[in-house]
C-alpha cells in the first residue's frame, strides 16, 4: 500500500486523511485552487470506463482550454484501474486509490514543482531526505526524445544542499522489485 510506504519513513504516523489535508493545504499556500475529485465514471470520455489517473479529468485543460478555477490547481482524485487487475496484490498494483496532484496550466514548470514536492515530503510529512528516492526520464532514442538532464540537476541540487549524496542506479524490472 502506497500510504504505508510513505508512513514508515515519517517521524510520526500519519493517516491518509492527514496526508491529503496537508498536501492540499500546502498547495493552497502556493496559490493553487483546490478542485473536487471528478466522478469515478467519466461523464464526457467514452474511451474509458473509469477515471484511472489524476490528470485524466484535466486533459482538456492540459491541452490548452482555460480552466474556470485558474492556472494553479490541486486535487485528490479518486482513481480505479482494472487493466492490470491480475497484478493486484503485489507491491506495485492496486485497483482503487486517491492520486494527489498539483497542476500548472502554463504557470510554472519543473523547478518550482520539484522544489515544492521536496519541501512537502521533508517539511510537511517529515521524511528524511536520505530516505527519498527519485527518478528521471532517461530518454527514448526510438522516439527521438532526449534524456531529462534538467530534472536530474534540480534533484541533485536539492539533495546536495541537505548533505545527501546522490547515487545513480538503473531501474529494476517489476520482477526484480
Regions found by a protein language model. Give the residues of each.
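Short, positively charged and aromatic/hydrophobic N-terminal segments
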Residues: 4-10
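Structured aminoacyl-transfer and RNA-binding surfaces used for tRNA recognition/handling
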Residues: 13-177
